[in-house]
UniProtKB/Swiss-Prot annotation:
Residues 146-176 are annotated as: Disordered. It comes from Streptomyces niveus (Streptomyces spheroides). This is Transcriptional regulator NovG. Residues 146-156 have a biased composition (Polar residues). One of its GO terms (biological process) is antibiotic biosynthetic process.
Length: 318
């Protein structure tokens, strides 16, 4: 995450930045991913009435979306200001979200426990290689809480995770053991060093896999076999939580306080997709004499939503 001068952006470096560049308020957009579940009217009023110079807000250069400082932006609008001080940052959407979480924790209103858990879940999806402790430090949660969230998460698993010190370490070793077993099945005479290098595991793990296979046992430990049995079930539950997404959209002031925004929310409210099971139940319940009409209406609705999606996607890439 860098600024226009290719300097590394951190909460500490931004805290020391008291001067940005003046930007038109009308050119800025709210975050695409909300860290905070809603705005505090009282906090906006306090900021609007303060005589102190507030720190510049942080904005992602590529999208013009606010990374940190929505309350300051709302306060500026409340005062009738036409522009606001901005510090621009560059980076991927995933890294921008992490920075937003760090900045929200560093100053301003504290995030609630649910907000921090939601942030941790999203970081697990975008940074699955991060260790529990690294995510815990970023979100202000206990490492045990992050571990619990990860165990129930639908995010994919990775062979290695990056800790707070930046070093990469093996995860549970399941994938590495499977690679080692496959290699030894093809070449039983492979040396431990060859297995270690090809499978990305330690010499001790490679030795244990070879010993297990020679005894006729599975390459995975009992605990790892139990984890593997749970993976297919987790995969079936994967997919966006549209209920949570819609709840965040309902709290976005740019939608809540405009006629077109409220119209969009009403449309979305009646269009949030259900689970596969729920859709199957609805399909089973449609009377035979209504099926043709329902099919036509469903396809028309799908086409209309696809048209809207295409228009929005075109604007993002313009």
């Amino acid at each position: 995450m860098t600024n226009s001068g290719d300097e590394e952006i951190t909460p500490a470096s931004l805290k020391a930045t008291r001067k940005g560049e003046r930007v038109s308020i009308g050119s800025l957009l709210p975050p695409s991913e909300l860290v905070r579940s809603g705005e505090s009217t009282e906090h906006i009023r306090v900021l609007a009435e303060t005589d102190e110079d507030l720190p510049p807000i942080v904005v992602h250069r590529g999208t013009r979306r606010v990374v940190d400082g929505m309350h300051r932006l709302w306060a500026a609008r409340f005062r009738g200001d036409e522009s606001i001080e901005v510090v621009f940052v560059d980076g991927s959407p995933a890294d921008v979200f992490v920075l937003a979480v760090e900045l929200n924790r560093a100053h301003g209103l504290p995030l609630t426990l649910d907000e921090r858990k939601s942030a941790a879940a999203q970081i697990m999806d975008s940074h699955p290689h991060w260790s529990d402790r690294k995510i815990a430090r970023t979100t202000g949660l206990a490492a045990s809480t992050v571990a619990s969230l990860r165990s129930s998460s639908t995010a994919g698993t990775v062979g290695r995770r990056t800790g707070q010190d930046g070093r990469s370490r093996p995860n549970d070793g399941t994938d590495g053991r499977q690679r080692a077993a496959a290699l030894l099945a093809r070449n039983p005479n492979a040396s431990l060093r060859e297995v270690t290098r090809a499978a990305g595991i330690s010499v001790g793990t490679a030795s244990d896999v070879r010993a297990r296979l020679r005894r006729g046992e599975p390459a995975l430990t009992a605990r790892q076999q139990a984890v593997m049995k749970l993976r297919p079930a987790a995969a079936q539950r994967s997919g966006p939580d549209y209920g949570r997404v819609l709840e965040n959209l309902r709290k976005d002031p740019s939608l809540r306080f405009t006629d077109l925004g409220r119209r969009l929310l009403r449309l979305l409210d009646g269009s949030v997709p259900g689970s596969v099971e729920q859709i199957a139940q609805i399909a089973d319940g449609v009377p035979e004499h209504c099926r043709t009409v329902v099919v036509d209406m469903a396809r028309e609705c799908a086409a209309a939503w696809q048209h809207l999606a295409d228009q929005l996607a075109d604007r993002d890439t313009a």
